[in-house]
Amino acid sequence: MRRREAIAALVAERGDAITITTEQAIGAWRATVPEPPNQIPDHLDIVGCMGSASTIGLGIALAKPERTVIVVDGDGSLLMQLGSLVTIAGAAPANFFHFVFENGVYETSGSQPLPAEG
């Protein structure tokens, strides 16, 4: 499934979930939702801080346990703060969903290949 198709499925089933996108997922998300970017309810674009979407999403999930939190991330971005996965696993919030798209490159910064693609 392509990134835009997967994001379209998430948007369609989102309900009242809080959503967080980062770097390359932002454009695909914005192209899919009907609202203008600054009017998407309960949505946050994480720009300029690769790797932070997962920990920001975790913080929101812990602060708002009654709400579903969906993070849409990229493999390169996640690798910037790989240790966040240990913290997420330790907290294990049932309302936190982290989707990671794999393209094997740091797309935002010039498509440099990841060290261990695949």
Model feature map: region roles:
Residues 1-27:
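Cofactor-pocket helix-loop regions in the catalytic cores of large enzyme subunits
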Residues 2-5, 13, 32-118:
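Thiamine diphosphate
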